[in-house]
Amino acid sequence: MRTLMIEPLTKEAFAPFGDVIETDGSDHFMINNGSTMRFHKLATVETAKPEDNAIISIFRADALDMPLTVCMLERHPLGSQAFIPLLGNPFLIVVAPLGDAPVSGLVRAFVTNGRQGINYHRGVWHHPVLTIEKRDDFLVVDRSGTGNNCDEHFFEEDERLILAPHQ
């Protein structure tokens, strides 16, 4: 099994998979009589159908045991999905490019700095949320509507990957 190299999350490296939601290096303008900086349109919510809705939820995630064997990835073909950390903790991201199925050799891993969120583009393969802390909270912006919006792909045993953030 291949061990994933964990990269620091940057806008450039993550661009094939989605958006990095952060203020560092992002354009802004002043509002509210000059008392507030607005970092505008850091990500776009994607939905497949006009009758779909963008919704906001909170996910409370428990940490998985590490090192983790990455056995599966999922994708949301009908909408984007954003994760914004509420407690300021770094978290892990495992992604693969768009396609009918994820290719094990193209899977990448990232770690946030705790002040970054991410927005997976519609159809991007990714691992379910991976917190480093024992428990963590995330603001999630995604799609509500009819139709199946979660495809799962389970890797064959020889395609599985190892995620070991502390090695």
Curated annotation (Swiss-Prot):
It comes from the Bacteria. Pathway: Nitrogen metabolism; (S)-allantoin degradation. The keyword tRNA processing does not apply. GO terms for molecular function: ureidoglycolate hydrolase activity; ureidoglycolate lyase activity. It catalyses: (S)-ureidoglycolate = urea + glyoxylate. One of its GO terms (biological process) is allantoin catabolic process. Keywords: Lyase, Purine metabolism. Catalyzes the catabolism of the allantoin degradation intermediate (S)-ureidoglycolate, generating urea and glyoxylate. Involved in the utilization of allantoin as nitrogen source. HAMAP family: Ureidogly_lyase (MF_00616). Homodimer. This is Ureidoglycolate lyase. The gene is allA.
